[in-house]
């Protein structure tokens, strides 16, 4: 059941992102009177699960329909195939006038919508655009007024970048939705009156438990999560207040620290480990620990805060440990056996800090902020990838993304991950690689700057090379996903 939920979340999330991305291209193309022959959610090699199109004024639907060719072999007067100079069969565009009236190909002015069976993306076929959806024969004809290639460069640029823009907008709106609808509240930085809990890796850089974050690189923040974010690891100057005195702590490029810390760097956990509830039949309940007790020791380690409990309990996995705790005015202790996860069997009371409720305006503001922060982190990740600090095997494909969604359908997590993927998809597609939106935009920018259109032959070669590279990358990440499953 877990695997089914993971797959379902992947398909729904990917379906949403593909639909809005290709929908951006679709709307932009239609705005400039460019024909869109096909609009598909997921790829449809050879066959489509379902497709529909307006033919003769009525909507027609097909299930499990085979893809029909838009070309036919060229033959001589004797019916023999005509070959080109390389000895390959020549093809020509099908004569639409000879097709029966109910043949969908006879109505190219209307869009065919459909759902394919290969959930690795989707496509919006734009008439006259040099990409993987166009046949050589189509591009060999004279440009038509309703084709992409006949439009001015600025219109073509908007069309190719529309998908990226929509993905970015959707990412911002989804982040805002998660903040306003699910999280609802945030922790103000100024509310962390007892300072942060500094885990070992933070202490090694000069932080101490109780430090109050004042600013990062001279910038102050309203939300705690913005001050203590992943951006801190890539080189920053953190101004803290300690014992009433402000001082700067310089953090270099600590990318490896970011990967290894697993979020345990600086956290607002500098408050007592007050037991809020005890799990039934758990070790803590058997030992007599009750709601309202405060954990103050593990073996010989003094536990002064919730952060310390989190940091030190892991070393006691599968061990029996003397746990000390305050029960009213009494200090008690019990021998407790930790399980493999080193969980004590209690829930600690939430942070004793005052939170604030997101307004609609704040949700949108921080939705944009979170989108930009994740975009920046992706840029830094690619920088590490190309510098060799990060390995290609760290890339994740569909299996890895499904695992990120997880085997439990949590709507807040689902929308957050979908928002994150929408921003990542925007970033990936805007890269200036032939075959991606950024590749098309690059050639259009060159045309705008030079005043000369890049020859179709160059575009076709670039598109072919780009698609080969992208397919190789896709096979690599999928293979890498499978390898990780059995590792």
Region roles according to the model:
Residues 3-139, 428-450:
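Small-residue-rich helix-interface/hinge motifs
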Residues 21, 115, 202, 210-213, ...:
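Terminal peptide-recognition signature
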Residues 159-192, 227-277, 285, 322-324, ...:
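PDZ/PDZ-like peptide-tail recognition elements
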Residues 461-481:
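Final/C-terminal transmembrane alpha-helix of multipass membrane proteins
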């Amino acid at each position: 059941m877990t695997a089914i939920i993971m797959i379902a979340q992947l398909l729904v999330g990917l379906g949403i992102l593909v639909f809005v991305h290709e929908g951006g291209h679709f709307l932009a193309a239609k705005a400039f009177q460019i024909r869109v022959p096909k609009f598909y959610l997921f790829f449809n090699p050879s066959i489509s699960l379902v497709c529909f199109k307006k033919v003769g004024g009525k909507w027609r639907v097909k299930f499990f329909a085979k893809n029909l060719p838009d070309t036919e072999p060229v033959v001589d007067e004797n019916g023999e195939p005509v070959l080109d100079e390389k000895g390959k069969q020549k093809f020509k565009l099908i004569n639409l006038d000879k097709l029966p009236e109910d043949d969908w190909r006879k109505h190219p002015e209307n869009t065919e919508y459909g759902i394919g069976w290969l959930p690795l993306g989707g496509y919006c076929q734009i008439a006259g655009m040099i990409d993987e959806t166009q046949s050589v024969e189509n591009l060999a004809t004279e440009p038509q007024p309703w084709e992409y290639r006949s439009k001015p460069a600025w219109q073509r640029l908007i069309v190719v970048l529309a998908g990226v823009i929509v993905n970015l907008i959707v990412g911002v709106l989804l982040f805002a939705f998660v903040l306003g609808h699910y999280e609802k509240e945030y922790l103000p930085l100024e509310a962390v009156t007892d300072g942060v809990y500094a885990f070992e890796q933070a202490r090694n850089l000069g932080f101490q438990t109780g430090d109050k974050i004042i600013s990062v690189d001279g910038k102050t923040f309203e939300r705690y999560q913005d001050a203590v974010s992943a951006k801190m690891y890539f080189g920053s100057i953190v101004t803290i207040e300690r014992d009433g005195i402000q001082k700067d702590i310089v953090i270099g490029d600590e990318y490896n620290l970011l990967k290894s810390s697993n979020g345990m760097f600086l956290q607002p956990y500098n408050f007592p480990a007050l037991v809020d509830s005890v799990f039934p039949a758990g070790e803590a309940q058997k030992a007599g620990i009750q709601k309202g007790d405060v954990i103050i020791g593990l073996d010989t380690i003094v536990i002064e805060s919730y952060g310390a409990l989190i940091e030190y309990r892991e070393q006691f996995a599968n061990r029996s440990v003397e746990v000390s705790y305050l029960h009213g005015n009494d200090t008690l202790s019990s021998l407790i056996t930790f399980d493999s996860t080193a969980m004590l069997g209690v829930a600690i009371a939430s942070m004793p800090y005052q939170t604030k409720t997101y307004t609609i305006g704040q949700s949108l503001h921080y939705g944009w902020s979170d989108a930009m922060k994740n975009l920046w982190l992706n840029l830094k990740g690619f920088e590490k990838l190309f510098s060799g600090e990060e390995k290609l095997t760290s890339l994740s494909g569909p299996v890895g993304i499904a695992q990120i969604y997880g085997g439990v359908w949590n709507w807040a997590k689902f929308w957050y991950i979908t928002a994150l993927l929408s921003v990542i998809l925007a970033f990936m597609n805007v890269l200036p690689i032939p075959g991606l939106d950024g590749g098309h935009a690059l050639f259009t920018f060159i045309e705008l700057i030079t005043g000369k259109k890049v020859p179709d032959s160059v575009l076709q070669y670039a598109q072919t090379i780009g698609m080969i590279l992208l397919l190789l990358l896709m096979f690599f990440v999928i293979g890498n996903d499978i390898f990780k499953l059995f590792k």
